[in-house]
Amino acid sequence: MTSNLIYPYPTLIPGVLRQRYKRFFADIELASGEIITAHCPNTGPMTGVCTIGSPVYISPSDNPKRKLAYTWEMIQVNNTWVGINTAIPNKVIKYALENQWFAQLKERYTTVRSEVPYGKDNKSRVDFLLTQNEGKSPIYVEVKNTTLCQGEIALFPDTVTSRGQKHLRELMALLPDTKPIMLYFINRGDCYSFAPGDEFDPTYGTLLREAVKKGLEVLPCRFEVTPEGIHYLGLAEFLTKL
């Protein structure tokens, strides 16, 4: 590949964040002075990245049935664009897996399936299941969007996540017969290392370290976000302790 551009954005509209409320709504002031309400595709607290008055970009929709005509895509934090649309990481990773972008996974799979049931009574779904020739162990890949940064270190989670804890326990249950991977999608280009967010969810941090000791593979993937698109930058250093 000659370019590390992995996901081009459609034409985006600049604005300024004026308010985020009820989790799903964001008031954005456009260059004209008009204030519009955009869909906020991130239900989390967005710790450290939701600062009123910050520059943002939104995408327009041509779907007349949509209640909100715009989607909030990114926000600028300390001169770095941070992707906040949680629907994007899985799209990017699916493309990357299908096109063998990750050197760490080369020749380890031939097929990619999304949202595959697994876990106790098949009541959970893993983001991606990678398989190859019969007799080879499948690879389970769970993706976590990561936006919080402290001193060039990306942290996940940014709040208590019982769902994230559940995913770690389910991936650990697959060991040692299969090879699970936790892929952290670092949705900003200013982080060079990754660590569990113990300050925000110490239980998650404990579980992650336990899972790694048992064989869980961690891929903290760095991405640069720009209004033109998302670029893959390679892996961040995984820090088990800060």
UniProtKB/Swiss-Prot annotation:
Any Pfam family the entry gives: SfsA_N
Family matches, as CDD domains: SfsA-like_bacterial
InterPro entries: SfsA, SfsA_C, SfsA_N
A molecular function GO annotation: DNA binding
Family: Belongs to the SfsA family.
HAMAP family assigned: SfsA (MF_00095)
Official protein name in the record: Sugar fermentation stimulation protein homolog
Organism expressing this protein natively: Rippkaea orientalis (strain PCC 8801 / RF-1)
Originating gene: sfsA
